[in-house]
Amino acid sequence: MMNNEHDNFQKEVETTTETTFNREEGKRMVRPLFKRSKKYCRFCAIGQLRIDLIDDLEALKRFLSPYAKINPRRITGNCQMHQRHVAKALKRARYLALVPFVKD
């Protein structure tokens, strides 16, 4: 059930630049290092308030690191409220033995 808001949602791209000095011409040159896309909360984009990811384990595992730790907000792009909901859902899934506590 996707809303039109999610379809119309566009990412903003921000470019980080590096300033270098060209000795031959005596001018400063600016070249882009990499393009960083602005992260957004995917749950806010579709207007989903309640997160119950226990039914969908593949979606739940997307928020885990390779060592089965919960990824922080700066990596997932979630807002504060939805990151807390994701963390609670992951902890519930760990308690129910759907997701491991630690990878070996």
UniProtKB/Swiss-Prot annotation:
It holds the Pfam family Ribosomal_S18. SUPFAM superfamilies: Ribosomal protein S18 (SSF46911). The keyword Ribosomal protein applies. Residues 1-14 have a biased composition (Basic and acidic residues). One of its GO terms (molecular function) is small ribosomal subunit rRNA binding. Keywords: Ribonucleoprotein, Ribosomal protein, RNA-binding, rRNA-binding. Residues 1-25 are annotated as: Disordered. PROSITE patterns: RIBOSOMAL_S18. One of its GO terms (cellular component) is cytosolic small ribosomal subunit. One of its GO terms (biological process) is translation. InterPro entries: Ribosomal_bS18 (IPR001648), Ribosomal_bS18_CS (IPR018275), Ribosomal_bS18_sf (IPR036870). Belongs to the bacterial ribosomal protein bS18 family. Binds as a heterodimer with protein bS6 to the central domain of the 16S rRNA, where it helps stabilize the platform of the 30S subunit. Part of the 30S ribosomal subunit. Forms a tight heterodimer with protein bS6. NCBIfam families: S18. This is Small ribosomal subunit protein bS18. It comes from Mycoplasma pneumoniae (strain ATCC 29342 / M129 / Subtype 1).
